[in-house]
């Protein structure tokens, strides 16, 4: 509530099935499993917006959305990542699946997340790794799997304008896949919902400071801790201060345009 933990509910991801559990802390009982039916795994962590409007779930390993089959040779074309924003009904103490939505992402591997607060309320931030889109295949002369997923010095922090995404849902600018509302990657880019900014390789956590002014990223394979300024990132977005776009068309902010310190 208002960015402060109130101890009423607990949310946790089911890593092997891509579901979210809602636990009522009055009796410590699991009241609900919510399944979006688009992704069959997640990182396990869940993160809530300042007034628990949404519970944020990041898919970890890319797959064809909805569980359809596609050969690994079509990884870049057919596989996708996902960020799900589960609408929470506090009065009922349940996730409202019908009013939840997901944002289609490139087939990088999404990791931990956090929601903005105060000046950054309405935004969310999520790590990623394997922006190399490595799929293994050492027997075919490709790099070993772990080495393949860690070749680059930088991965991408995903920056979401979830308030704008919510407006798109209300305006009907979404698809329905397996009965779940989905903002396509194309729409997310065109409508300014999704941006990337480089972050040191294989990060494991992005935490918003209590003031909501800074995002702190640290990783498993890169020693520095990187602090990003929300205002600097917002200014860069408004100025279109991009270093490039990824191959899916997502704008990439310049690292130094958003970095506060390291």
What are the residue ranges of the model-derived segments?
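Predominantly soluble domains enriched in secretory-pathway, periplasmic, or organellar proteins
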Residues: 1-262
